[in-house]
Amino acid sequence: MCLKRKGIFSIVASMGLVAGCATTAPAPEGPEPPQNLLGSTDELQLITELSIDLAKTYGGDQVLVVLGLEDTLLDTRGDSNASCAGNRQSIRPKQDDAAKQVERMQQAGLTVIAMTSRGADCQDVTIRELGSNGFDFQASGFPAGFSFASSDGMPSYNQGVFFTTDQGEGPALKQLVESAGQPYPALIVVADNQQQHLNSVMKSISTSAIKVHTWRYNRAEKQVASTGN
């Protein structure tokens, strides 16, 4: 016994604060490893809040956020190549505060990129279109100097925007992440309006050491339902 009895035990001993008597609690081993997750929402703010929480848990450099362009960031009305095919209609954000939500994730230190099924021939138009709507992915994308080499008709990457050229989002994204090199992200968060795109990503990446959170962004369907069209 560490303390002698003098009428009563010292309250200090009962609190475990005396040298040699205190029990040392095991040091925390860090956060639980991330798990795969599937969800759906019509609100980018939800994806933003959850991604920022993930950055606090695992570190912003360990979380890659991939946001679909077509009918997720921009209202393309189902036509991914509308502005690239000579149609100069004004393209607006799908959600009024979309650029603000993206900026919040960027300020939290997350790696954030946009992903589109458009081809490399649409790079200039697409980046200009995003910029005119308040989006800038260059600073929050892969580090300066990163080069994703691909042949004509294959996926390409420019200024934080990934052009998959309809080659399959999952295999293309896996190739992009591997090309960026280690350290690989612990978790990839993907938001897109097309379930098949999300399924492709989940199938290609989720069985590796990298886990995936997929979010089906269904605002387009909600808008159609609300207008009765």
Positions of PLM-derived features:
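Non-catalytic pre-domain segments flanking phosphatase-related domains
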Residues: C2, G7-A13, A19-L67, C84
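C-terminal cap/substrate-recognition subdomain and adjoining C-terminal extension
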Residues: P26-E29, A108-L110, G119-N229
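Phosphate/oxyanion-binding active-site loops and adjacent basic polyanion-contact surfaces
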Residues: S40-E43, S90-A98, C122, T164-A172
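N-terminal carbohydrate-binding/catalytic regions of secreted carbohydrate-active enzymes
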Residues: A55-Q95
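A Trp-anchored, charged/polar loop motif used as the substrate-binding/catalytic surface
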Residues: L44-L54, D96-D97, G170-S179
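Ser/Thr-glycine-rich phosphate-binding loops at phosphate-binding pockets of nucleotides
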Residues: T72, M115-S117
